[in-house]
Amino acid sequence: MEDVLATAEGVVLVKLVKVAQKLGLKGENGTWKEFLDFYDKQLGSSSLSDPSKRRKDDLVAFLTTLKKKEDLQLLAKSLKLDNDVFEKFKKKSLDETAEQRLVRMTLTHDEYPLDYLFPSNAEDWVRTGLGKKKMEPTKIEMIAIDCEMVLCEDGSEAVVRVAAVDRDLKVILDEFVKPNQPVVDYRTFITGLTAQDLEKATISVVDIQEKLLMFISEDTILVGQSLNHDLKVLKVDHARVIDTSLVFKYNYDGTRRPLRLKRPSLNYLCKCILGYEVQKEGVPHNCVHDAEAAMKLVLAILDNGAETSVPLSKEMLEAEKSKLYLHRIPCNVPYEELNGVVSRDIPHEVKPSKKQDRHYYSAIVVFKSPEEANQAFENIAGDFGKDSRGLSQKQIFLEPSSSEPRLYVLVRKMVEDDLVGEVIAEENNASSKKRKRENHSKGTRDRRRCKPLSRRKQRSNVKRRR
């Protein structure tokens, strides 16, 4: 959000502050007027509350104090509503195609506005469909994209490999990209790439943008799993997208209250929908395979009528209970240093997320059983609370440093303890209902076979025997 605000025009910032005023949004220093009382006192200036009469820096300073996810989503939605191209593809029409329905499902998802809020006004960004001539009909209608990223010295992520496949699963792009910053972490355990792999890379992000634009027009549909991360590192803002992490969702039927699990992973979707794992345990990612998998998931819906809800089984929940989620990890803290943060006594494995932002990243801590994960969480001495999803969470301070402020990470449960019981109870209930239906159906058939003949049919049978 900060990058977007820094490049936004003044009139846009004024509108956002007015939206925040109207909704009564509060940042770290309160509402807009409360913020001004604090802010102007520090600067020693007079307080003008009309946003249109304030400097751009003042507006940005207030908006960056808004930290609640739901508040940021509201602001992101306000920004997106100004995008005519976005509005065009968001609306439902009578002649809507199956492909466009998936685009609309993505664009109307609650998480979309914030995920796809890009600083596309910046000079090095490309916005498709704006002032560009539409390409000839040789264009590919759907393209799946996936990228591999590394961590740079300044804390930013840089794309180092890009893959794109078309609707026929033909690879139309597979390029190594030269990072424009010194790399501090190649994330070989995820990307499979090393410094040697990139020694001969000469292509820049600008070159990749030009190559992509050879295939993309305003009407092209870009496909991907958590595609916003890939578009962000490519610095491409494209309105017509299908994000499989937003299209597919867990089936929560039968539970007493909504479950707040993370979005289904690409691997889990492939297992449920396609019947295979795209990412094997201990094997680095391959962006070509990941792009193909995302396209196959979309084709499974379009060509085979696959459902967009995936089952929530007790086995899956048990596996989730064997994990803890580490987040808000500062990018300057290597993941290897996290091994003893959650527990020094209980064996576990730390698996960093493939996707990271400029300042923080997240990781999954995997234990051998739900009991060990729960014990590790109970042993943490940090402050207990709930995250925005209502899940149990604690704060862990890292080892103090003499030269830096004390850093901390947050650790939370993946699911609450009673949810597995709910799902098991619902599965047992469903099995019981199924048995009752089968028994009822069997009993009905038996009664029909044993039903006495009427007197007329009995006399008829006697006559035949005579």
Swiss-Prot record:
Keywords: Exonuclease, Hydrolase, Nuclease, Nucleus
Observed phenotype of the null mutant: No visible phenotype; due to the redundancy with other SDN ribonucleases. Simultaneous knockdown of SDN1, SDN2 and SDN3 results in elevated miRNA levels and pleiotropic developmental defects.
Domain Exonuclease: 142-298
Region (Disordered): 426-466
InterPro entries: Exonuclease_RNaseT/DNA_pol3, REX1-like_exo, REXO1/3/4-like, RNaseH-like_sf, RNaseH_sf
Biased composition (Basic residues): 445-466
Function: 3'-5' exonuclease degrading single-stranded small RNAs.
Family to which this protein belongs: Belongs to the REXO1/REXO3 family.
Protein name: Small RNA degrading nuclease 2
Encoding gene per record: SDN2
